[in-house]
A protein has these predicted regions:
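Glycine/tyrosine- and acidic-biased, solvent-exposed loop/turn segments at the edges of beta-strands
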Residues: 2-5, 15-167
């Protein structure tokens, strides 16, 4: 009986100890700039944040099980939104969008499993089209068009597996 009780207590202690040591999530990883200011805080689960060396917020990215997962946002030092990036399992996934400091949309890029996949669009600060490119699995495939700032089409080509077709 005493042996059974000792065994059960030992087993219980071992189980509790193992769970408390190995069951906890890692602490938040912190990095600092040379000037001593906080550069980034990256949790195993939760919202990671980074700052510019001057202290302004630089980015916020959600983490699940130590991997980027969800909608991340980045800002210019002046506070204007720079990018929104969708992540899934530590890779870009879905539509990412970028802006000029002035607030006008700079571009949109589709991603699948961390690679360009879909139409990549860019605009001038005026809002006029700058370029449209098509990608499949990270490689340019399809029509590419580029415009001058006045709206004049200056280039049109077709790409297959990253190589321009010569007509």
């Amino acid at each position: 009986m005493k042996t059974k009780l000792t065994f059960l207590l030992s087993f219980t202690f071992l189980f509790l100890f193992y769970g408390s040591v190995y069951g906890e999530e890692p602490v938040v990883k912190k990095e600092y700039w040379d000037n001593g200011k906080l550069k980034s805080e990256t949790p195993y689960n939760g919202l990671g944040t980074s700052w510019w060396e001057t202290g302004e917020k630089k980015s916020k990215i959600p983490y699940i099980n130590g991997k980027k997962d969800g909608l991340g946002t980045s800002w210019f030092k002046s506070g204007e939104k720079m990018f929104t990036t969708h992540y899934k399992n530590d890779k870009e996934e879905g539509l990412d969008t970028g802006w000029y400091k002035s607030g006008e949309k700079w571009g949109e890029m589709d991603f699948k499993n961390g690679k360009d996949d879909g139409v990549q669009k860019e605009w001038y600060p005026s809002g006029r089209k700058k370029s449209f490119r098509h990608y499949k699995n990270g490689i340019e495939n399809g029509i590419r068009k580029e415009w001058d700032e006045d709206g004049t089409l200056r280039y049109e080509g077709n790409f297959v597996d990253g190589v321009e077709e010569i007509k």
